[in-house]
Amino acid sequence: MIIKPKIRGFICTTTHPVGCEANVKEQIAYTKAQGPIKNAPKRVLVVGSSSGYGLSSRIAAAFGGGAATIGVFFEKPGTDKKPGTAGFYNAAAFDKLAHEAGLYAKSLNGDAFSNEAKQKAIELIKQDLGQIDLVVYSLASPVRKMPDTGELVRSALKPIGETYTSTAVDTNKDVIIEASVEPATEQEIADTVTVMGGQDWELWIQALEEAGVLAEGCKTVAYSYIGTELTWPIYWDGALGRAKMDLDRAATALNEKLAAKGGTANVAVLKSVVTQASSAIPVMPLYIAMVFKKMREQGVHEGCMEQIYRMFSQRLYKEDGSAPEVDDHNRLRLDDWELRDDIQQHCRDLWPQITTENLRELTDYDMYKEEFIKLFGFGIEGIDYDADVNPEVEFDVIDIE
């Protein structure tokens, strides 16, 4: 079929398999060009490995460190009627390219929150790898099915205490609007912590530990975002922030647990990037368009792959083998360049000046749109989007259920 982009709200409902593979190839090429990561882990499990930072983590481990990787994700394959999810095509492309490079790669598709996912992963590790040296936790899901009761819990992208009103961009109409978001209820806050906090990360590590598949010196890392006062009301000071604080709590508990085997647990605070997750957060697209422009001008802009390569090579697995620098909460900070005073001051000054008329001139809004559509495999140079493509790609993926 011939596949064109169809945007609805903040998601693109179609995906292009050839474009998704091109994205994965681009990240692999970047990683290889940087050179091998010294002291890299050799057996890596990535929970949430099909897009964004999770996918980049799998690429860094495999193509930067030569690691055997197992990826866990929840994605839909294509059928003869419609394309699959971008994550499915990303994961399929990764597997194919890893195998071509002579690397071990196996993937589990299903609900990563489930007990079954953990058991399947453990069986696979025992069967093929013995143990794991690094566990990356990179799940971004709006819903969690509780593993023991089957109850569905939903997260809320809402402020706490009062209605939040701010300038934002309507990405469908490309106009500046005033966006208002009602505050979260106590129940919504608790639910957001349940879905996006650290509990499932702890359950993964506990299951792996009890099964004896965590190697001596095993590290684990989970990803977070803190941002700045421009986004704090909706993010760090909102329901989502409570969940991210719970991730910090989990990291502290896991760090104590893993210390016995010479291991560590850290939250890595990453920069804002264009992902399906961030596009759903009011205010984020406009903030990203602003901060990207300034960071590009300063030569410090990074996408997912650049961030994760830097995290592996300059934080978790430093060349001299020394412990990584951390902040007061034992977090690895990779948002250091984004949070530079000159960059943030620029955004603060610019924010009130943005109008529909000057949006494209004062920010990297067009670049934001390009990166967004690229997530789904569109707008990539060298791909013929009028050509017939097969939405059903070959992928020897293991179904969890």
UniProtKB/Swiss-Prot annotation:
Superkingdom as given in the UniProt entry: Bacteria
Pathway: Lipid metabolism; fatty acid biosynthesis
Listed EC numbers: 1.3.1.9, 1.3.1.44
EC category: oxidoreductase
Catalytic residues identified in the record: 235 (proton donor)
Family matches, as InterPro entries: Eno_Rdtase_FAD-bd_dom, Enoyl-CoA_Rdtase_cat_dom, FabV-like_NADH_b, Trans-2-enoyl-CoA_reductase
MF (Gene Ontology): enoyl-[acyl-carrier-protein] reductase (NADH) activity; NAD binding; trans-2-enoyl-CoA reductase (NADH) activity
Claim: Hydrolase is one of the keywords in the record: no
Keyword Lipid metabolism attached: yes
GO BP annotations listed: fatty acid biosynthetic process
Binding site residues for substrate: 225
Residues binding NAD(+): 48-53, 74-75, 111-112, 139-140, 244, 273-275
Regulation: Weakly inhibited by triclosan.
Keyword tags: Fatty acid biosynthesis, Fatty acid metabolism, Lipid biosynthesis, Lipid metabolism, NAD, Oxidoreductase
Site (Plays an important role in discriminating NADH against NADPH): 75
Catalytic activity of the protein: a 2,3-saturated acyl-[ACP] + NAD(+) = a (2E)-enoyl-[ACP] + NADH + H(+); a 2,3-saturated acyl-CoA + NAD(+) = a (2E)-enoyl-CoA + NADH + H(+); (2E)-butenoyl-[ACP] + NADH + H(+) = butanoyl-[ACP] + NAD(+); butanoyl-CoA + NAD(+) = (2E)-butenoyl-CoA + NADH + H(+)
Subunit: Monomer.
Family: Belongs to the TER reductase family.
Physiological role: Involved in the final reduction of the elongation cycle of fatty acid synthesis (FAS II). Catalyzes the NADH-dependent reduction of a carbon-carbon double bond in an enoyl moiety that is covalently linked to an acyl carrier protein (ACP). It can use both crotonyl-CoA and crotonyl-ACP.
Protein name per UniProt: Enoyl-[acyl-carrier-protein] reductase [NADH] 1
Organism for this UniProt entry: Vibrio cholerae serotype O1 (strain ATCC 39315 / El Tor Inaba N16961)
